[in-house]
Structure formats: C-alpha cells, structure tokens
C-alpha cells in the first residue's frame, strides 16, 4: 500500500462550508468522518492521510461533488543516509547543513 495526502478545498461562504462538512460527516466513511479541517483558521479545506493502493483509490474516497477540486499527493519518507548517498552522486560529497 501507498500513503496519500488528500486535500479537498471548498467554498469559504459559511453555509457552503457547513454543508461541505455535513456531506463528509454524514457519509459514514471512516476516512471522511475523521478528516481534519482548516476552516476555523480561514483555510477552507479538509485533509486526510490514507493508506490505499493508488491515487485513483484515494480520489474515490472523496465525495463525487468534491473530486474535481481534490488534490492527491503521494507521501514518502526519507532517511539521512539515503539523502547523503544521492547527494554524493551529484556533488561528490554530502553537504553539511
């Protein structure tokens, strides 16, 4: 499985914002009912981190009305030794911070 960040923006108007949240919460989907929201800070988006097989599967979690504006980002992690090896190939030796 792969890990993805799903970002779902919605309109900032209060009634549109509330309806967007209502759609997510009434879906019954574990992912949607556990979304994090930025509305209280003026960022009208929901975020979820999900472990699924691919981007299409991640997008299909999003309610259909919100899919066209959703952004799916594949996530990964790094370890310092891998970065130092890659840097050494490009510049001859790892850079020191």
Locate the predicted segments by residue.
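Conserved, structured core segments of small domains
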Residues: 1-97
